[in-house]
UniProtKB/Swiss-Prot annotation:
Pathway: Amino-acid biosynthesis; L-histidine biosynthesis; L-histidine from 5-phospho-alpha-D-ribose 1-diphosphate: step 1/9. Gene3D superfamilies: 3.30.70.120, Periplasmic binding protein-like II. The gene is hisG. This is ATP phosphoribosyltransferase. Its EC number is 2.4.2.17. It comes from Salinispora tropica (strain ATCC BAA-916 / DSM 44818 / JCM 13857 / NBRC 105044 / CNB-440). The keyword Repeat does not apply. GO terms for biological process: L-histidine biosynthetic process.
C-alpha cells in the first residue's frame, strides 16, 4: 500500500485534498482525522504538518508527499521534487528598512531573521556571504523593529505585511515556491506511486485545457483548424447539413476566448467550451 503525506492544515491542505479528490482518491471528511485509507486504490494518506513532510518522506517512513518547495529546500531532507502541482505559489525574499541594504552581498556580517534557516543558509552559502541566521517560528517582520535582526527573509505574496512593518524587499528572490510532489531521493519506483503521478498529471492537464467544439463550413476547415490544432490533431466529423463539419479540439484555457473570437471571424458557429475533468495524454 502506498503511504502518502498530505498537509494537515492551511491553504496547501485544502488545495492538496481537492486535487487528490479530482484524481479519484478518497480524502478525510473530518479535519481531525490523521489518517485516511483508500482501500479501493491501495493507498493511505497521513495528514502532517507541511514542514515535517519532506523529513518523513526523506527518511523512507512515507513513500511520497505533498509540500511546498520552500519547505522541501529548508528541510535539507534527502527528498526530491517529482512534479510541480501548480498551486500554493509564493516568492521567498529578503526585506529590510528602506535604503539600509540594497543587495544580498550587503548581508555579510548582518543578522537575518527567518522561519526558514536551512533555505537561507543554503542561499547565502551559494552567494559566498556570511551572515548570522536567526531562526524564528513566525511574525519575522517585528524582528527588525525589536532589534533582534537587521534583515528578514520570508515568503512574500502581496508584500502588504512587510510594508506595514516599514520594510521593503531587495535583491533577487531566494526561491519561487509552489506545492510539489516529493519522493525519497534514493527510492525505488512504486507501482501505486507511478499511478498517483499519472493521475495528478491528468488533473494538471484538465485544469490547463478545455475542450472546444464548433461547426464550420468545410471549405473553411483549414483556416479554422489552424487555430485549434489540438494535441495530436483535431477531431473532424461531417454534419447532416451539406458542406459543414463539426470540429473538436483541446485548447489552452487561458487562450479560449481569443480563439473563440477568431473562430467566429473565420465563419465558425455553435462554438462551445466544455471543462475537462481528467485527461491522459
Amino acid at each position: 500500500m502506498l503511504r502518502v503525506a498530505v498537509p494537515n492544515k492551511g491553504t496547501l491542505a485544502e488545495k492538496a485534498a481537492q486535487m487528490l479528490r479530482e484524481a479519484g482518491y478518497r480524502q478525510r471528511t473530518d479535519p481531525k482525522d490523521l489518517v485516511c485509507r483508500d482501500d479501493a486504490n491501495n493507498i493511505e494518506f497521513f495528514y502532517l504538518r507541511p514542514k515535517d513532510i519532506a523529513t518523513y518522506v526523506g527518511s523512507g517512513d512515507l513513500d511520497v508527499g505533498i509540500t511546498g518547495r520552500d519547505l522541501l529546500v529548508d528541510s535539507g531532507a534527502p527528498a526530491t521534487e517529482v512534479v510541480d502541482l501548480g498551486f500554493g505559489q509564493a516568492t521567498f525574499r529578503f526585506a529590510a528598512r528602506p535604503e539600509d541594504i540594497d543587495t544580498a552581498q550587503d548581508l555579510d556580517g548582518r543578522r537575518v531573521a527567518t522561519a526558514y534557516p536551512g533555505l537561507v543558509e543554503r542561499h547565502l552559502a551559494e552567494l559566498g556571504v556570511k551572515a548570522d541566521v536567526i531562526r524564528l517560528d513566525g511574525a519575522v517582520e517585528n524582528a527588525i523593529r525589536l532589534g533582534l535582526a537587521d534583515v528578514v527573509a520570508d515568503v512574500v505574496e502581496t508584500g502588504a505585511t512587510l510594508r506595514q512593518a516599514g520594510l521593503v524587499v531587495f535583491g533577487e528572490p531566494l526561491l519561487r515556491s509552489s506545492a510539489v510532489l516529493v519522493c525519497r531521493s534514493a527510492a525505488q519506483p512504486h507501482p501505486q506511486g507511478e499511478l498517483l503521478l499519472r493521475r495528478l498529471h491528468s488533473v494538471l492537464v484538465a485544469r490547463r485545457y478545455v475542450m472546444l467544439t464548433y461547426d464550420v463550413p468545410a471549405d473553411l476547415l483549414a483556416r479554422a483548424s489552424s487555430l485549434t490544432p489540438g494535441i495530436e490533431s483535431p477531431t473532424v466529423s461531417r454534419l447532416h447539413r451539406e458542406g459543414w463539419v463539426a470540429v473538436q479540439a483541446m485548447v489552452l484555457r487561458d487562450d479560449v476566448h481569443r480563439i473563440m473570437d477568431e473562430l467566429y471571424q473565420v465563419g465558425a458557429r455553435a462554438i462551445l467550451v466544455t471543462n475537462i475533468q481528467a485527461c491522459r495524454l
